[in-house]
Amino acid sequence: MAVAIRLNRQGSKDRPYYKIVVVDSRARRDGRYIEQVGSYDPMKEGVNYTINLEKVDKWLANGAQPSETVNSMIRKARKA
């Protein structure tokens, strides 16, 4: 089973909110996920995401592939 770390859209029309989740790479965008590792609110000013780096590191060590957007967020979180 190929595993990915990507965004899962929540919220409502014109008010998006995303969960950063670990999923089977074949799953639908908003389908079932294995574990939630963070969240992202694009409407919020300033720091608008949270990531549990311990969980992310565990999944990356097990071969999970992050999406481009999530990979960018992980890099920014490591710098902070």
UniProtKB/Swiss-Prot annotation:
InterPro entries: Ribosomal_bS16, Ribosomal_bS16_dom_sf. GO terms for biological process: translation. Pfam families: Ribosomal_S16. It comes from the Bacteria. Keywords: Ribonucleoprotein, Ribosomal protein. One of its GO terms (cellular component) is small ribosomal subunit. GO terms for molecular function: structural constituent of ribosome. HAMAP family: Ribosomal_bS16. Belongs to the bacterial ribosomal protein bS16 family. This is Small ribosomal subunit protein bS16. It comes from Akkermansia muciniphila (strain ATCC BAA-835 / DSM 22959 / JCM 33894 / BCRC 81048 / CCUG 64013 / CIP 107961 / Muc). The lineage of its organism: Bacteria, Pseudomonadati, Verrucomicrobiota, Verrucomicrobiia, Verrucomicrobiales.
